[in-house]
Amino acid sequence: MSYFGLETFNENQSEENLDEESVILTLVPFKEEEEPNTDYATQSNVSSSTLDHTPPARSLVRHAGIKHPTRTIPSTCPPPSLPPIRDVSRNTLREWCRYHNLSTDGKKVEVYLRLRRHSYSKQECYIPNTSREARMKQGPKKSKIVFRGIGPPSGCQRKKEESGVLEILTSPKESTFAAWARIAMRAAQSMSKNRCPLPSNVEAFLPQATGSRWCVVHGRQLPADKKGWVRLQFLAGQTWVPDTPQRMNFLFLLPACIIPEPGVEDNLLCPECVHSNKKILRNFKIRSRAKKNALPPNMPP
């Protein structure tokens, strides 16, 4: 390359370098005109309508001619006369106090007094001293009970006569059944259980005397001039009849459910009943012997 050609090339290169260094670049933001977007508006309207679930406000205006349901509060109307405190509950007394616009505070006795003082001032009522008495209620009247046993238990129906004798009512049929049940129960036992030794320090045999004595089985006064009156003995919860000075037998007869007058001895047995009781025991002894001597039914004669 010639000298002139090289010089012109260098000049051109220097000019280009100067031009690039002298150029100043300025950045200006580009603004585009916003066009109305109908699609976006329709989508927003649809989404807002689907998300809005709030119900419209209820109108509180009552229109004429339309019956609206009303809530009624039940109220207990108090009676014309105040019942006894034992026959009414505390909650009922409070309802009556609310009916009269009275306070319901306090115990049952206090509420009862407050109600009586306000609305039943002229009525006389029994006021218990303690709250326990106020809670107690009188139960129904007890039904009449007819005794079906041997002795006179508590709670049985008793008939008091002018003479002072108390009689427990028992039908003859029931007495017979009770006597047979008693006899059958003792008959199944051995003879040793129906007899026991007589204590030596007791006065079991009574002598003849004037007047009368009370018989337990007959339930009435009988002449005491006969020989054979005995005094019953009580041992191990059972009643025994003296037979000999060393032995006594079980009482198989059913005593009468009659209580004598006060001061009359009621644990005596007349000679006739002593003989009947001994006869029953003798029959048991004979039957037990016959049962032992009897051959089995499957044995040949």
From Swiss-Prot:
Not detected in adult tissues. This is Developmental pluripotency-associated protein 2. Residues 39-52 have a biased composition (Polar residues). GO terms for biological process: epigenetic regulation of gene expression; lung-associated mesenchyme development; positive regulation of stem cell proliferation; stem cell population maintenance. The keyword Nucleus applies. Binds to target gene promoters, including NKX2-5 and SYCE1, but not GATA4, and may be involved in the maintenance of the active epigenetic status of these genes. InterPro entries: Dppa2/4 (IPR039590), Dppa2/4_C_dom (IPR025891), Dppa2/4_central_dom (IPR025892). Keywords: Nucleus, Transcription, Transcription regulation. Residues 60-70 have a biased composition (Basic residues). Residues 31-85 are annotated as: Disordered. Disruption phenotype: Mutant animals show survival rates similar to wild-type until 16.5 dpc. Then mortality increases and no animals survive beyond weaning age. At 18.5 dpc, the lungs of mutants mice show a thicker mesenchyme and smaller alveolar space than those of wild-type animals. Residues 85-119 form the SAP domain. The keyword Transcription regulation applies. GO terms for molecular function: chromatin binding. It comes from the Eukaryota. GO terms for cellular component: nucleoplasm; nucleus. It is found in: Nucleus.
